């Protein structure tokens, strides 16, 4: 038995292009080639036939006119280099002024004294420091002590 290639060809029924369906129109858009330029308008059947006959033309006709917009580039902020900052003299640079909380000398000294103590014993040591040092010898006539609760 011999393997023979079938002599039958597959024919797709394509609509015939008729001269009646093709319309030639002068391309007179005022750019100077109105006399020589011609446009050819094809109906849907003729366009389909042309696409089937020539796949390269079909790819060109189906291709988008512009490259696709990639949105993931627009979602990220664009890194713009910063302008070089003006060099300023250290004498003219203002620094924030930190206001010291208003405390009497006894409280400030007591707080400084308990900083080296373990955190769980600080409250007890602070109270002992206040009792030991709040006397008339350190603060004669109550000078430097708060006049009322919550003043310092």
Swiss-Prot record:
Q: Which UniProt keywords apply?
A: Developmental protein, Differentiation, Spermatogenesis
Q: Which cysteines are joined by disulfide bonds?
A: none
Q: What Gene Ontology biological process does one annotation of this record name? A: sperm individualization
Family (UniProt):
Belongs to the male-specific scotti family.
Function statement: Post-meiotically transcribed gene that has a role in late spermiogenesis; required for actin cone progression during spermatid individualization.
Put simply, this protein is called Male-specific protein scotti
């Amino acid at each position: 038995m011999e393997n023979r290639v079938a002599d039958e060809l597959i024919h797709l029924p394509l609509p015939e292009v008729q001269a009646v369906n093709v319309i030639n129109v002068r391309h007179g858009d005022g750019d100077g080639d109105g006399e020589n330029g011609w446009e050819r308008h094809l109906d849907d059947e003729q366009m389909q036939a042309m696409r089937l006959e020539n796949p390269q033309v079909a790819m060109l006709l189906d291709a988008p006119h512009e490259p696709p917009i990639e949105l993931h580039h627009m979602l990220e902020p664009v890194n713009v280099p910063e302008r070089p900052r003006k060099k300023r003299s250290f004498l003219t640079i203002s620094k924030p002024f930190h206001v010291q909380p208003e405390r009497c000398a006894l409280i400030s000294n007591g707080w400084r004294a308990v900083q080296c103590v373990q955190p769980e014993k600080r409250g007890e040591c602070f109270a002992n420091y206040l009792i030991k040092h709040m006397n008339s010898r350190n603060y004669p006539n109550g000078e430097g002590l708060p006049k009322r609760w919550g003043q310092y």
